[in-house]
C-alpha cells in the first residue's frame, strides 16, 4: 500500500537539512547517507547522493525521473554473480 497523500513524502530530517544547506550555498557536493528509506523530492534534483548498500556508499545522481522513488531503489544490496555454467572442455577423460 502506498503512503497516504495527506502525510506527504518521508525524508529523514538530517538528509533534508543537508540538501537544504547545499541548495542554499549553491554547491553540488556529494551527500553521504544511510537513509535508504527516504523518498526523492524535487529539492534533490541535480545532487549526487551516496547511498549506503550495506558495505559501501553508491553514488546516485538524482534526475527528474527519480522523483517519488526511494533512495534505496538505486543502490542494490545484493550482487548476483550468475549461475555456474557447465565446463564441458575441462571434463576430458
From Swiss-Prot:
One annotated GO molecular function: rRNA binding
Claim: Lyase is one of the keywords in the record: no
Gene3D superfamilies: 30s Ribosomal Protein S19, Chain A (3.30.860.10)
SUPFAM superfamilies documented for this protein: Ribosomal protein S19
Record InterPro entries: Ribosomal_uS19, Ribosomal_uS19_bac-type, Ribosomal_uS19_CS, Ribosomal_uS19_SF
Keyword Ribosomal protein: yes
GO CC, one annotated term: small ribosomal subunit
The entry's keywords: Ribonucleoprotein, Ribosomal protein, RNA-binding, rRNA-binding
GO biological process terms on file: ribosomal small subunit assembly; translation
Protein family: Belongs to the universal ribosomal protein uS19 family.
Function of the molecule: Protein S19 forms a complex with S13 that binds strongly to the 16S ribosomal RNA.
NCBIfam families per record: rpsS_bact (TIGR01050)
Name of the protein described by the UniProt record: Small ribosomal subunit protein uS19
Taxonomic placement: Bacteria, Bacillati, Actinomycetota, Actinomycetes, Micrococcales
Gene: rpsS
Amino acid at each position: 500500500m502506498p503512503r497516504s497523500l495527506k502525510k506527504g513524502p518521508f525524508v529523514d530530517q538530517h538528509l533534508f537539512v543537508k540538501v537544504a544547506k547545499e541548495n542554499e550555498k549553491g554547491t553540488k557536493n556529494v551527500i553521504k547517507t544511510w537513509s535508504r528509506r527516504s523518498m526523492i523530492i524535487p529539492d534533490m534534483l541535480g545532487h549526487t547522493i551516496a547511498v549506503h548498500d550495506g558495505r559501501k556508499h553508491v553514488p546516485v545522481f538524482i534526475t527528474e525521473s527519480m522523483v517519488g522513488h526511494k533512495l534505496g531503489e538505486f543502490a542494490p544490496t545484493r550482487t548476483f554473480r550468475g549461475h555456474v555454467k557447465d565446463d564441458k572442455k575441462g571434463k576430458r577423460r
